[in-house]
Regions:
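Extracytoplasmic surface signature
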Residues: 1-322
Length: 322
């Protein structure tokens, strides 16, 4: 897990830590990061842990906002591209190419506006160079397509309001996919050919914008919103789809008109919130599902009426805290 913390489980851990999912106990893995920046994104790529953020040192080495760490020792390896501003998101394409998104305008001192492709072995910048006019917050890989969300309104001189589909074969966005959100998109998840998006938007649609309050489900080919319409009354910051449920985190206190404080599960067919209601007391920034357990990270200090400082594990079947 990554963030801006300097302590985990009562032990010193600067911005990165590893926790045993079976026991909930902090492991000995330590990335040796003394800096004041943040870790904003983590991706496992074969035998290395890729991280991005605002840091300038990590894994006992100088690394400028991008690094690859050894999963055993926490040491930085030789992979060390540099970004001149925040890296918010990392993804690995099917051919192994590392895709970075953020607010940067240079990678390895070469112009790349908010999105870039990087060689996974050498760290060299690759020729692919779409140009986004504002920040990229999330990149989701689905087959040969990269779905991109953020604050941008154009990519390579093509109008794309906060959402776009890209291919590594071209610098311009896919022409037929243009959902046209009226405000920022923070996260994307793809399931069964559908693209679930979470953000600050209230209108979305490629031809005629329709009301979708912070959550929407889009056709993966046309970009048209489906009938799925959960309606959150505050920001939806993250979305994680599993089977027939979309788990959503953010700042909201209602979903579908029902009380749901910052975490909810929404039926992917009906768009209605399920009975799952962990009730956390502050913002949720990240959700991860594994083996019927939902892991949540954020600013909260309680969940389900119990003390949980910034991390919680919740049984998705019972709603009980672990």
């Amino acid at each position: 897990l990554g963030g801006s913390f300097n302590n985990a489980g009562g032990l010193p851990r600067n911005r990165l830590a590893a926790i045993d999912l079976n026991t909930g106990v902090l492991t000995n893995w330590h990335a040796g990061y003394p800096g004041d920046g943040e870790v904003r994104t983590i991706v496992i790529n074969e035998d290395q842990i890729l991280v991005g953020g605002s840091f300038l040192n990590i894994g006992n080495a100088s690394r400028t906002r991008l690094a690859a760490l050894d999963p055993v020792t926490g040491e930085a390896n030789s992979w060390g591209p540099s970004a001149n501003n925040f890296v918010f998101t990392l993804a690995v394409a099917g051919d192994g190419t590392v895709i970075a998104g953020g607010s940067f305008t240079q990678i390895n001192a070469t112009g790349r506006n908010r999105i870039a492709a990087i060689d996974p072995v050498s760290g060299a910048l690759l020729p692919w160079a779409p140009s986004c006019n504002n920040a990229v917050y999330h990149i989701e890989v689905a087959g040969e397509t990269l779905y991109v969300g953020g604050a941008f309104t154009s990519i390579s001189a093509n109008t794309r309001n906060r959402l776009a589909a890209l291919s590594l074969d071209a610098n311009t966005p896919v022409e037929t996919w243009n959902p046209n959100a009226n405000n920022e998109v923070y996260q994307i998840d793809v399931a069964d050919g559908l693209v679930y998006v979470a953000g600050a938007f209230t209108l979305i649609g490629p031809t005629t914008q329709i009301t979708r309050s912070r959550l929407a489900c889009l056709d993966g080919i046309t970009g048209e919103p489906t009938s799925w319409d959960p309606t959150a009354n505050g920001l939806a910051i993250c979305v994680e789809v599993q089977d027939d449920k979309a788990f959503v985190g953010g700042t909201y206190t209602q979903v579908g008109g029902r009380p749901r404080n910052r975490i909810a599960a929404v039926n992917t067919l009906t768009g209605k919130p399920t009975v799952f209601n962990p009730n956390v007391n502050s913002t949720v920034y990240a959700l991860e599902y594994k083996s019927n357990i939902l892991y949540a990270g954020g600013q909260f200090t309680s969940a389900g009426g119990a003390t949980r400082n910034r991390l919680a594990a919740i049984d998705v079947n019972t709603g009980s805290l672990l």
